[in-house]
Amino acid sequence: MLSKFVLLCLLLFVLCSSIHAQDAANPPDAQSNNVVVDPWQGLPMGLDPTRVIDLALEEGWRVNHVLPTARADDAVFVRRVYLDLVGRIPETSEANAFLECNNSGKREALVNSLLDTDEHAEHFAEVFDAILIGRTDAEQLGRRTKAHWIDYLKRFLRENRPWNEVAQEIVLARSGSTVDQGANWYLYSRNNKPQDIAEAVSKDFFGVRIDCAQCHDHPLASEIEQRHYWGLVAFFNRSKNVDTSEGPGVSESAIGGFSEFSNLEGKSLPNELVYLGNRRVEESRPTKDDKEEDRDELYVSNNDSKLKVPKFSRRGAFVENVLTDHPLLARATVNRLWGWMMGRGLVHPVDTLDSYHPPSHPGLLDWLARDLANSNYDIRRLIRSLALTRAYQLSSAEDKFVDPQWFTAALPKPLTAEMLQRSIIVALDPADPSQWNTLEHRASFAKSFPDVLAEESISNVAQGLLLTNGQSINDLASMKHSQFLRSLRDKHDTDSAIISKLFQTILGRIPDADEINQCQGYLSKRIDQRDQAIEGIAWAILTSSEFRFNH
């Protein structure tokens, strides 16, 4: 184990050497004030990722003459980390326990504790589900739950299984056991549409939007070619959904799937098994006069006649020759999790890992991707490293403009549908939380708040209608259903005490003088409707932008 002193010396040596070499070879653009600092290419593995991130970002601040905000206070941090790691605001008792603790290492201890909970696995299963499958209605949400997809994701996160192995299982879609059978849902849910599958696989596992290469080579990123699009489609165009005794499955034919595509010049080209980086899989291609015959000897024998597995499997070849050890798998994972924790990826948007969208810190992204691969694709370790960085623990910039690519301030992040719904339940404390967490309730929130890691956050009419007229929110924010509001009314005599408790419980902070005056004025005019007045203030806080964002 390297001592902190030796580590720092090593980092500074590599840093200074790399900066000097870069400055000599690539002088800054005289018309640009932004200098991309990339001293991390020669940095060895085995170092603490948190420390590497801190030093990389701090050097970027120095070179670009930008200053970070102050460290977020404990009240802001505890709300932020609960939302990011377990998908809800902290309960009052949890927040108070953290705020009253005087241990200097309490932030690290809290991060470790939250990452080891079932809530973390459940929350990130929802995040991965939204990223990999997308939003849907209550019926479809019920189907994917019944197909054990959600359980599969929870188990992977609870056991902290290597992400590359999980990715292979999902793309191969050949899990027959009840425990792993849920992995099949990713392909099954695409309903035998190989182009949809190819576009999803490229975006979800490699961070590359390949759909614009369907008709021609990518006009802005030359490394993405039309043959890569149709080559990726070919890996999946022999797949077919089947329903087995264990649930949804994806069979695969041993023949067919040979076609051609036309480029802009009208020339027809074969759809060879190839993807980005020219990772090609050789396959014997029949001539036009050859007639393929589907025979039993082309398949591996198995107990389920519906679930055919060919001896030469295109999906298997893709997993073995393309997905396994592909550098984009680690890069895409790092970038997406960075975006989740920091509010923006090192490459932005997060699904554009191409030459047209260079990373803000290219060497750092390279180093973190190699570090993730060397750590056996340990997702939890990466999340922990990000949560402990200086950048993650900065305060927000409030009204001051900051260039987000330098991560000099915490970027406000909109709560996902699940985070918002769960946080409302935690704040209002209904007697029966399950009543407010049905498939229908979850689907209504997901429909109105569909985005996860969106390029930009834009409120819409559906969100406004749900928050202002949604029956579930109005019902829950009532004395009838909220144990918190009833307790507030019964235990506190003064308006100031009620107002303070509302803000502390819902927003995790005390109200300022203007907020106290406004709320007191509202209550004083409704003495004969005190219950409704308290409900109104609670509803206003719950539907505020401050509550709907993680700051």
Show where each model-derived region lies.
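Long, His/Glu/Asp-enriched segments that create or flank divalent metal/ion-associated functional microenvironments
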Residues: 425-469, 474-478
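Post-BTB helical module
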Residues: 83-84
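N-terminal pre-domain segments of enzymes
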Residues: 22-58
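Bacterial N-terminal signal peptides
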Residues: 6-17
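Positively charged n-region of N-terminal signal peptides that target proteins for export
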Residues: 1-5
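Metal- or metallocofactor-binding catalytic centers and their adjacent structured scaffolds
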Residues: 118, 122
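Primarily short, surface-exposed interaction patches in extracytoplasmic proteins
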Residues: 47-79, 89-116, 133-428, 455, ...
